Amino acid sequence: GTGDYRTLTEAMEGIRAFMDYKVTVLVKKGVYKEKVVLPSWLENVDFIGENVENTIITYDDHANINKMGTFRTYTLKVEGSSITFKNLTIENNAARLGQAVALHTEGDRLVFINCRFLGNQDTIYTGAKGTRLCFLNCYIEGTTDFIFGPSTALFHNCTIHSKANSYITAASTPKDIEVGYVFKNCKLTAAPDVDKVYLGRPWRPYAATVFINCEMGKHICPAGWDNWRNPENEKTARYAEYGNTGEGADNTNRVKWVKQLTRKDVAKYEEPDYLFKICSEWKP
């Protein structure tokens, strides 16, 4: 069609390094089959799609291609910071052949608004300790551990869709970082035949994951959480819930090592300073 660039990679090469002013890249609808890396020198850029359903960045690498491993399978890798993505679909459309990452983040202060993340195992890898991410009004789907990694990330008003009986999150929050994954006002849905999904299992011992005021379908199993075959993780994992609704939110048979938060506990999750105080002040 008409535009200044034909691919995202071309568009990025037209942007100056470490800019102190904001640049907006408008992405016309279409299917962009490319593996995109936004390098660490890219900052202060907004990528805005024309329409989330029809503006698709897709690739199909998976972990079992030539010993590729999980961490090189991404469709979109974001190494830059202070970048916003809006109205885009990021997809890894590999068949179910092992880990296949759609989004891999390394940068800080990344915001995703009204985006869709499509894949199977390991859809979103929040890959860097001490980085902060914000997902607003997004749709995220996958099979196993499809939101995983060490970053601090807020998921607000998102739909989290399980395509298989498995685990939603696998946080690897470092011990010295208080906030890992926070799901607020999200809707947890599943494919028709899915009936046994766990909210999370700890990829590392101090995994931190909280669900607040979320609507949980009946596919969420009564125990809620899994210790990843290691009872020692029950002493260290920081898992909590508050005010959730729906059949999957019944905590009568929840594992004993998950914390049920009080209203006072939850109040601090309203504070951007608390959520994102890891380093410099940031209010997305």
Residue spans for each PLM region:
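Sequence-level preference for short, compositionally simple segments enriched
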Residues: 1-284
